[in-house]
């Protein structure tokens, strides 16, 4: 069992636009779904991408590992579990899994490393103090 610092669930319904000709979710869409869940995780904790961009900052994915275990299908209602597994002053490692709530089976899981960059210099940036306070004091909403 993985130990996580903070976590959040994101509900997801699968539509025809998400699937291939077989009715299975197209593999690239799992990254999109995980991105939505991470963005929702941040938004629910008062961390807004618009505010970061106004300060010439942005989160970028540095690394993504995905394991596709079972196919998600058209009209499935699923849960994406997002958790911060590890954090430092300039990066976070998220563990994410897509779960079928009916049977508890994991369909896909991923480890996503996210860094903060300065949009002017295009170089890694240490998290600003307000973000560090949220991350370090465990103030994320669970």
What function would you assign to each model-found segment?
Residues 113-115:
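Short beta-strand edge segments in extracellular beta-sheet folds
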Residues 2-61, 117-142:
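Hot-dog-fold acyl-thioester-processing enzymes
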Residues 105-106, 124:
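Beta-sandwich strand segments
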Residues 92-98:
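Compact nucleic-acid interaction/catalytic patches
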Residues 34, 96, 110:
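Conserved GNAT-family N-acetyltransferase fold
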Residues 102-104, 120:
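Solvent-exposed strand-loop boundary residues in beta-sheet-rich modules
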Residues 41-92, 107-110:
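Hydrophobic beta-strand-centered segment that forms part of the acyl-chain substrate-binding groove
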């Amino acid at each position: 069992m993985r130990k996580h610092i903070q976590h959040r669930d994101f509900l997801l319904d699968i539509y025809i636009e998400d699937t291939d000709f077989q009715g299975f979710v197209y593999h690239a869409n799992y990254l999109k779904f995980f991105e939505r869940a991470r963005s929702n995780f941040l938004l629910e904790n008062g961390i807004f991408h618009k505010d970061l961009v106004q300060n010439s900052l942005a989160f970028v994915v540095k690394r993504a590992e995905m394991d596709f275990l079972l196919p998600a299908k058209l009209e499935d209602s699923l849960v994406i579990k997002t958790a911060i597994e590890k954090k430092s002053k300039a990066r976070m490692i998220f563990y994410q899994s897509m779960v079928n709530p009916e049977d508890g089976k994991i369909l896909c899981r991923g480890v996503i490393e996210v860094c903060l960059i300065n949009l002017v210099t295009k170089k890694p940036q240490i998290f600003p103090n307000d973000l560090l306070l949220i991350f370090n004091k465990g103030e994320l909403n669970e």
